[in-house]
Amino acid sequence: MRTWIVMGLSLALLVGCGTKFVYHNLDWFVIDYIEDYVDLTKKQKTILSERIVNISQWHKQQEIPLYVQQLDKLSQITPRTMTVELFHEQEVEMRAHYHRLLQKIEPDIYSLAQQLSDQQVKTLILGLEKKHNKYADRYQGLTDTEIHGKYKSRIEERVEDWLGDLQPAQQQLVQQWADSMQITAYDWINYQAQIRTEVEVLLNQRDELSLFLPRLNRLLFEPESYYSPVLASKVEYNHALSERYLVQIIQLSNDRQIQHFQNEVADWKKILIDLQS
């Protein structure tokens, strides 16, 4: 489910704030986001802004056409043709988009890391810890039933984004899906703590390229390698479960929902094409 909505999540900010305005002022938005964690110097902002402009040009010319191609494929999918295998193919393609973007920005992450002072590193780690604590607070003291309720609300919201209001049979599947999921909230809390430690070690090695780059590569491209055996097992189970239930829900789509999906895909395609102009 997570990778199926990668494209939607990555573009949601653009739509909410005015697509072209955000895209053509992306450097400002990225800097503003980073400064939620650490204040940058004027020189750091200038360098980062220049790099983001270059990346945006690459993204517009090289990547957006690939997104449009995938949306065209999605528009051809019907409830009758949807299968777990087809779903998986779309996931793999979306993940490839994400990895290409990571590969493009990796040198700039290294460049920015080298410019950080020791105090900025400390501030960044504290900001990361604050964010992780907010996640932990959302689940503090919740029962398993309440957590499954959160899962249900999240699943329902994301599915309805693409299909519109669900039918009773689909709502029942969503309930079964959420109730069947293995709870990972506390495993993610532990994982976040480990990642925070890894990021701190990474940044403390920012002047040692031979140590920094392999660790950065692992964090960017192999985050699953930091999963505990228990979390890895739960994630694999929940992913397979999500694929199965989502396909069943799609297969039950009526004409209204099919049209809703087609409209969503068409809207995203228009957004992407507009960004290229």
Q: Whereabouts are the PLM-identified features?
A:
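Positively charged n-region of N-terminal signal peptides that target proteins for export
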Residues: M1-W4
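C-terminal motif of bacterial Sec signal peptides marking the signal peptidase cleavage site
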Residues: L14-G16
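Bacterial signal peptide processing site
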Residues: G18-K20
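Start-of-domain marker
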Residues: V22-Q70, L74
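Short, structured motif recognition centered on aromatic/hydrophobic residues
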Residues: I34, L48, L102-L116, L124, ...
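Mid-chain, structured segments of secreted extracytoplasmic proteins
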Residues: P65-Q103
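Extended amphipathic alpha-helical interaction segments
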Residues: Y110-S228
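A cross-kingdom marker for long, charged
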Residues: R196, E200-S277
